Amino acid sequence: MSNEELSALAPVGPAAYVYFTKTNHEMNEVLATLSLCDSSSPVVIAPLLMGLTVDQDFCTSVRTPVVCYDGGVLTKVTSFCPFALYFYNTQGIVDFSEPHGDVQRLCDETRQRYAIESYMPEEGRAPTDLAALCTAAGCDPQEVLVHVVVGNGMKEFMYAGQLIPCFEEAAPTRLNDCDAVRVPLYPPTLFGSLQADVDSDELSLDKRSSFVESRGLYVPAVSETLFYYVYTSWCQALRFSETKVLIEAALKQFVNDSQQSVKLAPHKKYFGYTSQKLSSLEKDHLMLSDAVICELGFSFASVFLDSAYGASDSMVYSEWPVVVNATDHRDLIRALTELKLHLSTHISALLFSCNSILYHNRLVYLTSNKNASGTGASQEVLLKSIHFANGLTGLCEDTYNDARKLIKCSGVVAKDERYAPYHLSLICGTCPQLFSAFIWYLNRVSVYNTGLTGSSTLSNHLIGCSSSLCGACGGTCCHTCYNTAFVRVQTRLPQMPRLPKKEPSVVVMQSRFLNDVDVLGTFGRRYSAESKEASLDAKADEGSASTSNRTASSSVDRTHRLNRILDYCKKMRLIDSVTGEDTMTINGRSDFINLVSSLNKFVDDEAMSFVSEVRMKSNRDEVLGATQAFNLDLNPFAVSFSPILAYEYYRVIFAIIQNVALITATSYIVDNPLTTSLVSRWVTQHFQSIHGAFSTTSSRKGFLFIRNVKSSKNADHDRLPDFKLYARGTYSVISMEIKLSRLSVPSLLMFRVKNRPISKASKGTTAHVFFRREHVPKKNPVKGCLGFLLYKYHDKLFPDCGFSCLQFWQKVCANALPKNVNIGDMGEFNNFVKFVISVTADYNEHDLIDVPPDCMLNYLENRFHNKFLCFYGFKDYIGTLHGLTTRLTYQNHAQFPYLLGESPNFASAADFALRLKDLKATGVTAPLASTVTRESLMRTIFEQRSLVTVSFSIEKYAGVNNNKEIYQFGQIGYFSGNGVERSLNTNSIGGQDYKFMRQRCILATKLSDVLIKRSRRDNVLFDEDIIKNRVMAALDSENLDVDPELMAMYEILSTREEIPERDDVLFFVDGCQAVADSLMEKFSRLQEMGVDDFSLVNLQQVLDSRPECGGGGGEVHDLSALFTAASGEAVGNSVGLNARGGEHAFDEDCGLLPAKRGRL
């Protein structure tokens, strides 16, 4: 896509549309399920989805006409906002929504409490007659839903009610199998006297011509929703309090390209400073940094959002597998609701984690003795001192103005000690629809009871609701109101931070495919030249020593070794060649010993060979520099399926831009001290230079990746309406020149999050205590590396023993196994137990990963890397990445009061228990809630395009070799708080041995086969592949009653009627010339004899010339002496020929090494 022409990605067209959709009951329910709505507002915030809210061929980015000049129009590139706003006849949608109490009143009180600006409709201006609007579009006002989609550059005009509908260009379309009409909206700048060089003061939210006054689409409810859902949130992210000033500035910024001018600083107030003990110099540095990154964030949000982005796979509603596979409407609603339940894990992380991106809107100066600035400060000191922190504290502090004078707080001064509904309303931008959506999730997440606050807390609350004194709903809907929701999750709510501190930020984004998340990540991995993201990374890391090993010319090839091991496992039928799932067959203890011993020997040999290769071609520093990395998508349409995630997307964008902007800001602040009385004056003096410096250095520094979409020509011709004539009442389409304001636009591509698995100890010191490995723990074999096999094949290994696997091994290890337990031959049993214990002990001796494997692929990778690291001299634990994927499980009815269906009216706990019993008796299904399970292979999360929640911080460091450039990288972090997800808690992971500090987790929901249709061929097996697998299995068969070559011939001929060609046979036997020659000789004999019956019995009769053995009881030569183990050898080497390789040894010289190495 990076080489795509701008004109193709963003065609000329309107950047706003109003849709009139003939709706029905089913459409309303689908919209209610996927949208944000509250009974206090007629506006429904819906997702931007092709086939549901916009056309199937909708263009997500356009070059839209903005200003007319003589003979043509000037166009600007913009992308659509990732949401749609329904505003007429929406009661049918809102009626499906769950009541949550008087949310509007709570939002109003929140604004008063924290001095947040409220929306005020224009005085004296009449709203647009929406019924007349429907009639003008040729629709019955009683039968249609009306909604609008708008581009980022047009949303301010939409807010101001200045977009002009052009009904002459109305076009029929279909949305979710409903008839619809689409009408374009044009900006007022096309119809007035504005020219490209007109003074920008003529452009305003309040100034408009009589034509715009009479024809503009003005819906106060839509303006109010934009005010809170978009702009109030933007103000919070920028630490700016004048919402209407920001809207006015955004309007002029798009039309007049004023990104390089100062717009917000003169109006900015600085909050959260008085509670910090800052010197005068530190306060100046913090205020300047605050003002500069606020301006850069606001300017570059316009640059990046008014750009070109293609549609994401997840926004094509009509192709969602959950939609396509639904059997009927009820099944569709069930599937969509379950999808939302999966998302509840991610929503929980955004709410319950103290370091959520939604809370990180405060800038703090954290000093230490090492970083103390004294009389001056370097850029390095400032970058180590200035951080984003949780902004829930200090909300009612006095603030500083532009003149650095203290201003008394105008809100209600209150000491917030506990997280309350006010705080949730605040982070929602006081948008009632968004707040209501969060409450829906809080009513459905799991309850985490504690010894102090057991399940009786919720039941006592519900019993008390009978008094109808609920402050949230007055007793009308206590089963779902926000007070009940907060009681349910009170043990999970985040703690209010007492002191500001540097913490990583928790975000929810969609993943990209490319990843390096195995044990050693980038080390020893070579990348194909075709990999676009790999080439991006190579460019990004120029001058950076920390990731220099992630290039296409890695000195060693670790992937080759892993592929050899995978090929061996496929050859031995231990794993499925397509899915990677375990497929081994174990019929007894000897099978188990042979399989494991042969596999261990092969893996250990590969690890030792890799050690030799690293010693010859690489060095220890390159191993220490191993980096695990994955990419997260910054395309706004990757999250357009959820308005909550679209809301959070803007917060992420502002946070990233401002955090990276700190580098540019601090470099100018250090060199140019504040000498004026006004902060805005200093910013005005330097902003143009700062803007230019940031635009050239913000990306390709290891963290943020941007692509430039270019146009080969700046002018074109097309047929458009004569806008000047249209303003006078006549519609006419003419050919005109179309100019593009910019030939190149930068668009956000992705950002990269990394982790260093190997802890670097300073010279002369030991590793950090979290990674230190001071002793080797002894483990019960069932809890060790072979545990997954011992569990799976317990019945095969010890048939009729009468004990479960865990109990059996506990008794064995305790020397307490009763004599009446059937264990078979005692000698064989002793050998098996010794073997299992020795393998477990050997694995533990080298286990630096400290994560028990749960499948064969897991075991292989862990053993290989453990052995390599130990053989190479590493002794301490390493850090690991873990993917926790969501799944739905049934829960207790009593913890989900929304199932009651009405406000509770219970006199006692017995009444409540009786009501629950009635619910179960009447067939009310147990509620589902989202939990997580650990993914065996982390990379599958990225290969199956998942929605991921991850915590990361943006770290900055200087380049090498006297390079003054400052580089960044996203460092994976932690989730702060015990209520995020129980699997993340210290006690769940391992608190006593610091395992929780070595493991970094991400939460994930796989979108493949849910929202994204698989478009790539995932190793589909052709018929020839299946035949080949059968032939190879026949050649490896241990069945002594059938000649393996005859069995192979039978498999080849089973699907054909003619003798195969030699090339086909060579393919079936995996390129082994000797076997192919032997088979072809037999095929020739069949052809000469004219045989046409290719059954196995007939092939044996025709070709098998072995002497008869006279049944199975004949005498045989005693060859046991050939296989007698030397006395004193380890148990693992005394169990038979396979312990030393034997017939399962995988020798490269045998000619059976698979020619193709496919990646699972």
Swiss-Prot record:
Predominant location: host cell
Q: Where is this region: Required for nuclear localization?
A: 1139-1160
Keywords of this protein's UniProt record, alphabetized?
A: DNA replication, DNA-binding, Host nucleus
Q: Where in the cell is it found?
A: Host nucleus
> Which cellular component, as a GO term, is one annotated location?
host cell nucleus
Gene Ontology MF terms: single-stranded DNA binding
Question: Motif range for Required for filament formation?
Answer: 808-809
For the biological process aspect of GO, one term held by this record is: DNA replication
> SUPFAM superfamilies given for it?
Viral ssDNA binding protein
Q: What does this protein do, in the record's words?
A: Single-stranded DNA-binding protein required for DNA replication. Plays several crucial roles in viral infection. Participates in the opening of the viral DNA origin to initiate replication by interacting with the origin-binding protein. May disrupt loops, hairpins and other secondary structures present on ssDNA to reduce and eliminate pausing of viral DNA polymerase at specific sites during elongation. Promotes viral DNA recombination by performing strand-transfer, characterized by the ability to transfer a DNA strand from a linear duplex to a complementary single-stranded DNA circle. Can also catalyze the renaturation of complementary single strands.
Self-association or partners: how does it assemble? Homooligomers. Forms double-helical filaments necessary for the formation of replication compartments within the host nucleus. Interacts with the origin-binding protein. Interacts with the helicase primase complex; this interaction stimulates primer synthesis activity of the helicase-primase complex. Interacts with the DNA polymerase. Interacts with the alkaline exonuclease; this interaction increases its nuclease processivity.
Entry's family note: Belongs to the herpesviridae major DNA-binding protein family.
The identity of this protein, by name, is Major DNA-binding protein
State the species of origin. Simian cytomegalovirus (strain Colburn)
Q: Give the gene that encodes this protein.
A: DBP
